[in-house]
């Protein structure tokens, strides 16, 4: 009931004179202001549970500095550095050694290790310089993803110029899960791919943590602990989890002119199917009148034992026209898709961390939708999409913020039978063919500003080698593209969208009212959106390009994991001629979950 009241409130906002629609204008240019042939899957996809990734905790440095005066000379001329695996391997009075010797010790990148320690040979060694040598060795190991190493200089006679150093690298001992309540310990420890008594590779372990933390119902971090045996290190997977079921309901005004702006939604997320951490998600979406749009969508995410991820997702949508002359005209579409994702090795340079993955898959889309293009419904239009997809994802984090990159390459061989042919595609968009290639790139940079302000820059670029069917075109207008315009007011084959957004520091309203248990956050937003698109091959009467631009303000408000509200109000700076010419509008989304 609360959702309905909130929806009514949202409609009241839109009924303000600043947001009141004017005369309805339907564009007749094919592909530029068309009703999308299939409801965008992202619009009706199940709402995600926000994940909280954790980083591995660095091992405590157990190596101790040499005490005493750092200027005290220990040896006038260092002739040899001998590295041994245990204190028991130190040889009293060792004299027959020269240069750098590794006795039963294996280091990562031996040539680089020699380059780190060999400059000390032939030098006068003080206590201070010896401490620098020890820290340089520890840093070398960490730079090579070996975080657990003890570098010990035992008591010895070094007047002969030979210095023996114990290099004790931690090996894998026990792997245990602690703190987990709803997920089994075996499920968590199986997500860490290490060999008993094997080396501890921090980069590989961070990849394992990322794999475990794909499940949004748990957060796992790694703590290194001394093992039972000398040289062993236990891996403690400290986990904070919650009951792996979330149900939610909400409202958005993300609909279109033909089927109504109101969208009511309800769904669930389940995060431990078969006790394997598999995720099952479902959402039902309907229009305000309950008949203009009815959509089912779902996804299944299966983390595989070898660290890859298999995902299936799909949707089924029924539509019915909401405005003259489209009243009663029905359409139907569905989609079945799959993706196989492979994480790539991450790398860490200084304080910059970069993580990436690649994925491949296939999309099948069926679209039978007579609510097409222009002022009058076309004859029944029917087309099938059969396309291969290659995806690249990258995330870079640094002290100043985060950069994300997502690239999707879509390839359709064409003429795969049924309604996957040039005749069907040309019927929904003049010049479109069933064989095509197009690429979509999305890049975003979040930069931390002074006083906890932040700046977000986001860009989307799409390019194609031919005219595309409506379901594959780049859409302009709506809360996640160019705000202030109707949802997918403009659709084109090629184009770009750019967003600049400034966000204030978050405010805890509950804290201000002395209700810290509320755990809420309020944030204000100011933004400028710009988009420009065109079709690959222009039809007679089509404009060369259609730019859109808007400025506005908004807010984001959350209460723990139970309530999420977004609200934006934007003013158009450029008119497309395709909308109802209201010049501005709001975009609102509300989700209640438990």
Give short role names for the model-derived ranges.
Residues 21-33:
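Bacterial N-terminal signal peptides
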Residues 2-14, 20, 35-442, 446-498, ...:
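Immediate N-terminus of the mature polypeptide
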């Amino acid at each position: 009931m609360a959702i309905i009241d909130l929806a009514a409130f949202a409609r009241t906002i839109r009924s303000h004179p600043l947001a009141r629609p004017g005369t309805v204008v339907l564009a007749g240019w094919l592909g530029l202001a068309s009703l999308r042939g299939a409801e965008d899957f992202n619009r009706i996809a199940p709402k995600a549970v926000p994940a909280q990734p954790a980083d591995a905790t660095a091992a405590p440095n157990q190596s101790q500095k040499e005490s005493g005066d750092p200027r005290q000379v220990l040896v006038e001329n260092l002739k040899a550095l001998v590295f041994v695996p245990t204190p028991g391997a130190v040889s009293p009075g060792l004299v027959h050694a020269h240069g750098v010797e590794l006795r039963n010790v294996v280091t990562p990148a031996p040539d680089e290790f020699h380059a780190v320690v060999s400059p000390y040979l032939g030098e006068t060694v003080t206590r201070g310089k010896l401490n620098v040598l020890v820290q340089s060795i520890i840093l070398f190991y960490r730079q090579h993803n070996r975080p657990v190493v003890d570098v010990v200089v035992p008591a010895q006679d070094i007047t002969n110029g030979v210095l023996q150093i114990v290099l004790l690298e931690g090996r894998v001992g026990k792997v245990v899960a602690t703190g987990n309540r709803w997920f089994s310990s075996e499920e968590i420890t199986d997500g860490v791919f290490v060999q008993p008594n094997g080396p501890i590779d921090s980069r590989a372990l961070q990849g394992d943590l990322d794999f475990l933390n794909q499940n949004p119902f748990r957060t796992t971090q790694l703590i290194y602990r001394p093992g039972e045996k000398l040289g062993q290190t236990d891996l403690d997977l400290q986990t904070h989890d919650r009951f792996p079921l979330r149900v939610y309901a909400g409202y958005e005004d993300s609909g279109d002119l033909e089927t109504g702006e109101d969208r009511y939604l309800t769904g669930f997320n389940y995060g431990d199917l078969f006790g394997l951490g598999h995720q099952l998600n479902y959402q039902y979406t309907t229009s305000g009148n309950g008949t203009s749009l009815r959509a089912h969508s779902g996804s299944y995410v299966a983390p595989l034992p070898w660290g890859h991820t298999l995902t299936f997702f799909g949707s089924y949508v029924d539509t019915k026209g909401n405005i003259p002359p489209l009243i009663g005209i029905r359409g139907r579409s569905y989609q079945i898709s799959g993706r196989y994702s492979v994480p790539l090795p991450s790398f860490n340079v200084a304080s910059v961390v970069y993580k990436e993955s690649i994925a491949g898959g296939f999309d099948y889309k069926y679209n039978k939708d007579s609510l097409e293009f222009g002022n009058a419904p076309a004859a029944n239009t029917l087309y099938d999409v059969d396309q291969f997809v290659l995806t690249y994802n990258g995330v870079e984090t640094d002290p100043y913020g985060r950069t994300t990159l997502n690239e999707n390459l879509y390839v359709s061989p064409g003429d795969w039978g049924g309604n996957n042919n040039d005749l069907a595609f040309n019927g929904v968009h003049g010049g479109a063919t069933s064989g095509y290639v197009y690429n979509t790139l999305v890049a975003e940079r979040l930069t931390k500003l002074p006083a906890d302000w932040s700046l977000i820059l986001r860009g989307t670029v799409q390019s194609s080698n031919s005219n595309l069917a409506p379901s594959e075109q780049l859409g302009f207008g709506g809360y996640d593209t160019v705000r202030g315009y109707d949802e997918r007011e403009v659709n084109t084959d090629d184009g770009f969208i750019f967003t600049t957004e400034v966000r204030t520091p978050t405010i805890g309203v509950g804290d201000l009212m002395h209700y810290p248990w509320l755990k809420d956050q309020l944030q204000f937003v100011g933004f400028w959106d710009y988009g420009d698109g065109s079709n690959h091959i222009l039809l007679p009467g089509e404009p060369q390009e259609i730019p859109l631009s808007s400025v506005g303000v908004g807010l984001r408000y959350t209460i723990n994991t139970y309530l999420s509200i977004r609200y934006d109000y934007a003013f158009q700076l450029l008119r497309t001629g395709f909308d109802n010419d209201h010049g501005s509008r709001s975009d609102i989304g509300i989700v209640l979950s438990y």
